[in-house]
Regions:
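A beta-strand edge to alpha-helix "cap/lid" segment located at domain peripheries
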Residues: 46-131
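Short, aromatic-enriched amphipathic alpha-helices that serve as compact interaction elements
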Residues: 1-5
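A solvent-exposed, acidic/Ser-Thr-rich amphipathic alpha-helical stretch
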Residues: 7, 12-68
Length: 131
């Protein structure tokens, strides 16, 4: 998904999977239900890839005591074409896998870093203050 292949990433989800964004900024859905909805949303988000150049990504995967659940920390960095500055973005994913498919993915992304990356800090501030 970090590499801009959201539609392909969606194929890893079960037909009735749920993708959540608990810290979703204004204008972004907090929950997507079903592989098709996930594919449609991630496909639409691929246009945002034109706003930045990713130079690298790192991930750390942590096992849990639940054999169906892994926790992953994904950080990518590069250049924001919107701000003309380097960026660093980290998200934490709590992923439940059953029968080889993702059934639930809770994506705890940093909405402030995302707003900076996309040049939308003003929109985020206005949404938070009601301005």
């Amino acid at each position: 998904m970090v590499a801009g292949e959201g539609v392909v990433f969606a194929d890893l989800f079960a037909a009735d999977a749920v993708l959540t964004y608990p810290f979703a900024p204004p204008g972004q859905p907090r929950e997507l239900r079903g592989r098709d909805a996930i594919r449609d949303y991630l496909g639409a988000m691929e246009q945002a890839r034109e706003l930045f150049t990713m130079d690298g990504a790192e991930s750390v995967v942590r096992e849990t005591t639940d054999p169906e659940v892994v926790v992953t920390e994904i950080t990518h960095h590069g250049w924001s074409h919107v701000t003309g500055a380097p960026y660093r973005f980290t998200a934490l994913g709590v992923i439940r896998v059953r029968d080889g498919e993702i059934v639930c993915y809770d994506d705890y992304m940093d909405p402030i870093a995302l707003a900076r990356l996309l040049g939308r800090t003003g929109e985020l501030a206005a949404a938070l203050t009601g301005a």
